[in-house]
């Protein structure tokens, strides 16, 4: 074979190789231009707003569009119009924070039947393909009681100020709080009652007043909801109970730093909700692309957060865990802006 023919063959092989490489690269890339609906518990909760913003950041990086839609109340009924809007728009995916694990399922299953992918984040639902968990559920619940116990010197009565009575994440955390309380370490601590503020500031403040009136010997309040803990802190900071009642839970540094500095709250915990939404954004995009299906062992890349693996959750269903909770104190709370 002469030199010219060798050159033609070599060029042909090179072009073919480039084509194969390009095809493989294209198959691994995200197909941009999709629309995804983020349906928070409600649109007024600052925590949910931050999480949704993280989701928008992820989808913008991927060249997609985010629509945030929900009601202004923490109920499943208030989320139904948003789900129907996603169905009508033939959205590529829905990311929802459940107010009720089952009530939204008929509508979500209708969405799935037409090809819309469904992921839950922050608070789980029964009919999703994947759950983006802010931290290991058991770790959150147990660490809340561990922190409360330390702050109460492991003795006295305390109450829990939760969100909605049907909130999946709240109930799961409280389950593990109760399990942690069975340890001998907490034999001198007593949970007197669980109150529900429905993630409404006014209702949460009233619940705080009610528990203090009902239990004059109350020593602590545990609130695993950002609305609950900030509302309770606001009331306590202007009352005779400031510095006398231990208040801890899950809070936003931006809302809680004032109460940490004025002595109302010593320590509280959370994770970065912006990162939670960001992770959910990458996960729903990967699912819409067919890169993951929600099967245990699936892997995907989540932008700045790196590599994630789908694992089996405590209930046996697939989930992705953002990371461990973080404890905020007067020494570090000013370092955070979310």
Task: Identify the role of each PLM range.
Residues 2-9, 24-338:
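A residue-level marker of the well-folded mature domains of exported/periplasmic proteins
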Residues 10-19:
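Bacterial N-terminal signal peptides
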């Amino acid at each position: 074979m002469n030199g010219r023919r060798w050159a033609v063959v070599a060029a042909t092989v090179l072009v073919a190789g480039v084509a194969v490489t390009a095809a493989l690269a294209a198959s691994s890339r995200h197909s941009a231009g999709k629309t995804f609906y983020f349906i928070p518990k409600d649109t007024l909760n600052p925590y949910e707003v931050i999480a949704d913003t993280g989701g928008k950041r992820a989808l913008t990086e991927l060249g997609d569009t985010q629509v945030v839609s929900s009601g202004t109340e923490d109920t499943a009924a208030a989320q139904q119009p948003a789900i129907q809007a996603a169905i009508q728009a033939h959205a590529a995916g829905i990311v929802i924070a459940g107010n009720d694990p089952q009530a939204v399922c008929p509508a979500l299953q209708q969405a799935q039947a037409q090809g819309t992918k469904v992921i839950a984040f922050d608070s789980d639902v029964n009919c999703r393909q994947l759950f983006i968990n802010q931290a290991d559920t058991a770790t959150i619940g147990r660490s809340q009681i561990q922190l409360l116990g330390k702050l109460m010197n492991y003795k006295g009565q305390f109450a829990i100020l939760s969100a909605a009575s049907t909130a999946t994440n709240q109930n799961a955390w409280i389950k593990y709080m109760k399990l942690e309380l069975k340890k001998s370490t907490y034999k001198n601590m007593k949970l007197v009652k669980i109150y529900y503020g429905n993630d409404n500031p006014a209702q949460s403040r009233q619940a705080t007043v009610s528990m203090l009136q009902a239990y004059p010997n109350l020593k602590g309040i545990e609130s695993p909801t950002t609305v609950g803990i900030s509302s309770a802190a606001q009331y306590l900071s202007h009352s005779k109970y400031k510095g006398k009642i231990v208040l801890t839970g899950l809070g936003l540094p931006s809302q809680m730093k004032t109460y940490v500095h004025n002595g109302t709250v010593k320590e509280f915990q959370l994770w970065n909700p912006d990162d939670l939404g960001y992770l959910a954004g990458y996960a729903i995009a990967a699912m819409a692309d067919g890169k993951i299906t929600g099967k245990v062992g699936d892997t995907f890349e989540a932008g700045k957060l790196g590599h994630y693996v789908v694992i089996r959750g405590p209930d046996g269903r697939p989930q992705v865990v953002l990371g461990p909770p973080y404890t905020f104190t007067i020494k570090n709370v000013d370092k955070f802006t979310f």
